[in-house]
Amino acid sequence: IRIGGQLKEALLDTGADDTVLEEMNLPGKWKPKMIGGIGGFVKVRQYDQIPVEICGHKTIGTVLVGPTPANIIGRNLLTQ
């Protein structure tokens, strides 16, 4: 995927609600959010209206940035 001008590898996860990326700097304002995973709850930064390109397909959506074992593309971007 290409996000914020940076090229990253990510997993397409149809079971994940949200798109969560490992620590990176994104432009714009963010707000704190808590998400639940297998290891319990994690505090992440929520960025809205971020342009993302997945295999040549462009979309704009909400991206969460925080401590995650892998970059995950969730249903919020897959359904667009």
Predicted regions and their residues:
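Aspartic protease
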Residues: 2-80
